[in-house]
Amino acid sequence: MINNGKALNNKKSSDYSKLFRHQAKFVAGANHINQIPDFSLPEIVFVGKSNVGKSSIINTICNNKSLAKVSNIPGRTRQINFFNIIDKLIIVDLPGYGFANVPISVKEQWEVLITYYLRNSHNLMLVNLLIDSRRGIKENDKKVAELLLANKREFQIIFTKSDKVTDRKNLNYEAQNFLATLHYSCNVIYVSSRSKEGTKELKASLAKCIKYQR
C-alpha cells in the first residue's frame, strides 16, 4: 500500500499520539556484536544509505531535534544507537550503508554489525527501509531487502525527503515493481522531516508493534 501522507482513519490514532508525546532517551550504543543489549522490549529499526535522513526522521517522530545526531556528512552514525520511549518501545538507528567516506575496514565492520543485528535480534518487530526520494531504489537497498526477507523480517519502505519531489509516479511505479520482484507486500510511506508529511502515518505504524510484543 502506497501512502502519500493521507491521514489515517482508525482507532489507533490516539495510541501513537500518546506514545510519542513522551520523551525518548538514548540508552545504549553498540560498536560490536557483543555490545548489543537485550531490553526485552519491541524494537523498531531504521536502516538506509548514508545521508538518507535517518537521524532527522528519528528526531521528528520523537519530537526531539537533538536526540539523534544530524549531519550533512555521510557516515555520521558509526554505531547502533538505541533509544527508549517510556519502556514501551526501542527505536534503533543503524549505521548507514553505501557511500560513507570511511576506510574499507570500517565499512566491513559496519556490515558485520548490521547483518548480525538484523539476523539475530529477538525483539525486532519492524524494519523501516529508508530510501531517498530523489535517488530512488538502488542496488544496496535491494540487497538489504533480500536480507530481511531471508530472515523473515517484516519491513516497510519509507521514502525520505518527500518535500524535494513533486512527481511521484515514477517512484510509485519503481516501488511496486521492486516489491513485485521480491514477492512481498508492505506499506510505502512518503515522509519529510521538514514538512512533517507522513509522520502521523509512520508513528501509527510503529505504535501498532507494541500490541504484538512477544
UniProtKB/Swiss-Prot annotation:
Give me the residues that bind Mg(2+), please: 55, 77
Q: Which InterPro entries match?
A: G_ENGB_dom, GTP-bd, GTP-bd_ribosome_bio_YsxC, P-loop_NTPase
Question: Which pairs are disulfide-linked?
Answer: none
**PROSITE patterns, alphabetized:** G_ENGB (PS51706)
One of the GO BP terms on file? division septum assembly
- Taken from the record, one Pfam family name reads MMR_HSR1
Give the protein's cofactors.
Mg(2+)
Instruction: Give UniProt keywords alphabetically.
Output: Cell cycle, Cell division, GTP-binding, Magnesium, Metal-binding, Nucleotide-binding, Septation
| Boundaries of every EngB-type G domain copy | 40-212
In terms of SUPFAM superfamilies, this protein maps to: P-loop containing nucleoside triphosphate hydrolases (SSF52540)
Keyword Metal-binding belongs to the record: yes
The entry lists its GO molecular-function terms as:
GTP binding; metal ion binding
Q: Where does GTP bind?
A: 48-55, 75-79, 93-96, 160-163, 191-193
The family annotation for this protein states: Belongs to the TRAFAC class TrmE-Era-EngA-EngB-Septin-like GTPase superfamily. EngB GTPase family.
- State the protein's purpose: Necessary for normal cell division and for the maintenance of normal septation.
Provide the protein name. Answer: Probable GTP-binding protein EngB
Organism whose genome encodes this protein: Rickettsia typhi (strain ATCC VR-144 / Wilmington)
What is the organism lineage in this UniProt record? Bacteria, Pseudomonadati, Pseudomonadota, Alphaproteobacteria, Rickettsiales
